[in-house]
Amino acid sequence: MSRPEILAPAGNREMLGAAVFSGADAVYLGLTGFNARRTAGNFTPDELREAVAFCHARGVKVHVTLNTLVYDRELSGLADAVRAVAAAGADAVIADDLATAQLVKSIAPTLHLHGSTQMSVHTPEGAKELAALGYDRVILARELSLEEIRAVCEASPIEVEVFVHGALCMSVSGQCMMSAFLGGRSGNRGACAGPCRLPFDASAGLKPGQPGRACHLSLKDMDYIPHLRELMDAGVASVKIEGRLRTPEYAAAVVTACRAVCAGQPYDEKLVRDIFSRSGFTDGYLTNRNDGKMFGVRTEADAAATRAATPKARELFRRELQRVPVHYELSGGVEDGGVKLTARDDDGHRVSVYSADEPQPAQKDPLPGIERALGKTGGTPFVMDGLAAEPGEGGFGFLPGAAWNELRREALDKLLEKRSEVTPHAVQAFEMPTYPAHTVGQLPALAARFANAAQCPAEAAEKLQYLIFPITEAESIPEAWRGKTLLELPRVMFGRLEQKTAARLDALQDAGFAGAVVNNPAQLRYTDGWTLYGGLGLNVTNPMSAARYASLGVQGMLLQPETALTAMQAVAPGVPTAALCYGHLPLMLTRACPLRNVRDCGKCPGGGTLRDRKGRDFTVTCSASGGAGVRTVFNPVPLYMGERLRELPVDVAVAAFTTETPARVSQILDLLFNAQPFDSEFTRGLYYTNN
């Protein structure tokens, strides 16, 4: 089995040096703006060029994160960012939005394109779809088991990258809106405030309004370092360390540990644990142990351990790691009046230097001493990998040790300088497409999403343009409704759910349904013959990504709920667009169950609540018990736009019902049909912000 790339975080220049000096094969870093860690130090275009030169000189690749959702007003700036990455000579772009992918392929097609974990790709068909879209690598969701990772690796035509150490988001990446709707800072836009680390308490017996105290949404850091050999065997091409917001010492400690395990050597487990943990680590997802032991918080004892471990970790990157093989060629000698030393690497770089001093006849064989002098490469990234000696007439002769040392230094300095030369990617001319704006002021048609058929009032079904139901409810939908019913596919499909979903679609092909709502790129591969609409999971926020999905056969799409009305107006891809007009927004989609902190699945009624520090209750629903199930955490206050429907610049307004009773559904639909104000507490979400 081949050793995977060790990919380390570089949140700033110091962390970059620590990652490289401790042995990372590649680093990932953010260009200022457009990356999922906007609060990291990040790099300007000039700093990026310097970083690439530094890394490439040492045989280290640079992956640049442009992995946030973008709005129409930002597309020109994003195109400039792609040009900056190409000019810097970086190796790859990590992209989330399909607009970013399109810009990379249009502007700098030789740049490698990696599908961010924010795309929520986690299945074999998802990897195949990214390959079809032009991606060179898929970065899998963190929630997968070893068996699921292996299945993707075996099926994937492109490289597979997995996270192996660092912070675990509670939500599936790309499917979290908690920070945006609770604090106005979108994780999908690189500004997550980490609200899941605050108290969200699943404990029973809390009095109404009593603040929650337990942090039941806070997962321990993941640690798959002990499992690296298994991941290598599974076919993983790159193992990624999370942590651009952490310290250089953290990066060095984890990189060093990964290198040791990949080489079959022991590593300092205590140092890895002490440099950062949240009451220890978890490998629950990888090993199929989805239980309460996955959760933990950062304690004062953890912080004290980090302070104590930091000096030791700092020693790991005090000096250059000698990793770049250098081959020497030596010629000339006494009769030639000097010697010529050539240094070359395996990448085709070659430099030559000449002795300033004239050699004198040697009393003994000088070659052993010459080899010792040329092998002293400490303090450089080079390691001697052979000497080809071709002495002239009279032999090499004698030169003092200082002269050989100076020759070596001069040769290696020149070779390092040559390796540091940046090779930009060719940039193609690209004119940003223009997109029409959506008309404002027209009344959108009404559609509604229901959790099940019993929740939908018969009289409302006749008045709504579309009815949307989970595909699991298909058989219970009355035939009279099917002509206007769209079957909603799952946003995530763990275990065997992808195969089951594809099989169910095949079985329902001729059952009279109006279409299917796709929520993951994977689903584009097994929905042939269906009229397709894009759902919440596609995260469409701009006209370029909307147009790309339309070109892939999507005939209408729900815009991402964080999108402000002004940004929505710019999304008019030539197919109908939709926006939520009512609903308790799904703030998180999780595989780990927060309720497992207080009870096991056998004692669970299929859901529960979480109490935050302000005394508010967040409903949690569960699709199935165990690791195959998905939990959804809902906002306690519903979004409502009933009396402002004309302000939604879309064709269809969608009311999303979850746990409401049929009677309550009827009341809310009446308010919407009559454009009436809401009858209880509500929110306008982020529609009127300038996000």
What is the predicted role of each segment?
Residues 1-21, 26-37, 51-52, 58-86, ...:
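Surface-exposed amphipathic alpha-helical tracts and adjacent flexible/coil segments at the periphery
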Residues 122:
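Active-site PLP-lysine loop of aminotransferase-like
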